[in-house]
């Protein structure tokens, strides 16, 4: 006979801490008090516990790497790190916080990184591809250093969700793929005040291709540039078959979204661009062999507020671009500025003013 469940559920009434613990122990056993205390410390999936202090998150990561991978749970509060987090083995590592909060505060999980030059805040970079892993529900606030907030190389099936990155000293999220990187899910993040790019997908470092990845519902504000993708520092790799859905770009200092060299089969859907200092969307190359092609942009809304040079700037040998439906207005140059060697551009339901 199944255990009868009271309805409505019997409430837990308490007046102070001891009564709360007594009530929890009555329901869950003698470990309830320890469980509550453990929520204020760093815990990993091996069941090991560290105090909330600088350096201990890396110890928790190394501990699960020794066990083939796993998860680390961070407590509410602020931790100031003077060294970065490193995952340098081909094993899955998941780091979960207690929620985003404003930088510098402790209303959620707030990780301040005060680093020396040349060190990333969070670095997933192993000898070969890291399969699976992710970052969830906390704030990254770099206050010193000159590298990326989150840096990946050759990673697949990886998530970054509900992360707030403010004032990245270089890029907020940077894939610098010497090998292939795929199935990256970057969604529901807040990325603000980055010195350079909010998201940089660099497929040309080696032969690596960044592909089959998804960037959804991210909010960008006042970054040097919001999104940059392509064979940016070389021409061997590329970026292809990626989707950008429902991202919002506000008050970007430079270009909102830039594609440069060997970018193929990209879908930009539901984007809002507001008052970008450079072009809202810029697509270019350095020759016909490295052209960008098969790009779809729409629906899209670009409000230049009288300061954005061009809504969509198509240069080089860019080929097969579909723009619309949507609206592009408030620019100082053109809604769609098409270079002389750009071919096969189609506008569908696009209002330009």
Spell out what each predicted region is:
Residues 1-37:
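Extracellular "spike/adhesin" assembly and maturation modules
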Residues 36-37, 44, 61-68, 88-89, ...:
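Flexible, charged surface loops at secondary-structure boundaries
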Residues 69, 82-84, 104-107, 114-120, ...:
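Short glycine/acidic-rich loop motifs that flank beta-strands on beta-rich extracellular proteins
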Residues 122, 203-205, 231-234, 285-287:
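Short, recurring structural edge motifs at helix starts
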Residues 62-65, 92, 96-98, 107, 123-154, 160, ...:
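Right-handed parallel beta-helix
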Residues 5, 30-59, 78, 351-352:
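Right-handed parallel beta-helix/beta-solenoid
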Residues 53-58, 62, 69-117, 139-140:
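N-terminal extracellular ligand-recognition/capping segment immediately after the signal peptide
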């Amino acid at each position: 006979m199944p255990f009868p469940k009271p309805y409505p559920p019997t409430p837990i009434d308490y007046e102070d801490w001891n009564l709360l613990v007594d009530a929890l122990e009555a329901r869950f056993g003698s470990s309830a008090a320890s469980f509550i205390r453990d929520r204020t410390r760093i815990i990993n999936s091996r069941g090991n516990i560290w105090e909330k202090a600088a350096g201990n998150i890396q110890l928790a990561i190394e501990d699960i790497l020794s066990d083939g991978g796993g998860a680390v749970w961070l407590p509410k509060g602020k931790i100031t790190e003077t060294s970065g987090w490193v995952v340098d083995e081909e094993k899955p590592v998941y780091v979960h916080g207690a929620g985003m909060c404003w930088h510098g505060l402790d209303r959620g999980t707030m990780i301040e990184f005060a680093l020396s030059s040349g060190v990333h805040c969070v670095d997933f970079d192993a000898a070969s591809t890291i399969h699976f892993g992710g970052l969830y529900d906390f704030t990254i606030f770099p206050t010193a250093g000159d590298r990326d907030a989150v840096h990946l190389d050759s990673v697949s099936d990886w998530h970054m969700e509900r992360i707030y990155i403010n004032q990245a000293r270089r890029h907020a999220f940077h894939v610098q793929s010497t090998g292939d990187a795929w199935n990256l899910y970057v969604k529901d993040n807040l990325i603000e005040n980055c010195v350079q790019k909010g998201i940089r997908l660099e497929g040309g470092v080696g032969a690596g291709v960044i592909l089959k990845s998804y960037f959804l519902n991210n909010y960008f504000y006042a970054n040097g540039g919001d999104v940059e993708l392509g064979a940016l520092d070389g021409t061997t790799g590329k970026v292809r078959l990626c989707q950008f859905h429902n991202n919002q770009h506000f008050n970007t200092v430079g270009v909102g979204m830039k594609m440069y060299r060997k970018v193929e089969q990209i879908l930009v859907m539901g984007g809002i661009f507001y008052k970008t200092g450079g072009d809202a969307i810029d697509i270019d190359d350095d020759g016909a062999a490295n052209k960008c092609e098969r790009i779809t942009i729409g629906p899209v809304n670009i409000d230049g507020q009288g300061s954005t040079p061009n809504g969509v700037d198509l240069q080089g040998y860019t080929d097969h671009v579909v723009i619309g439906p949507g609206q592009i207005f408030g620019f100082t140059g053109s809604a769609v500025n098409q270079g002389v060697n750009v071919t096969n551009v189609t506008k569908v339901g696009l209002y330009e003013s």
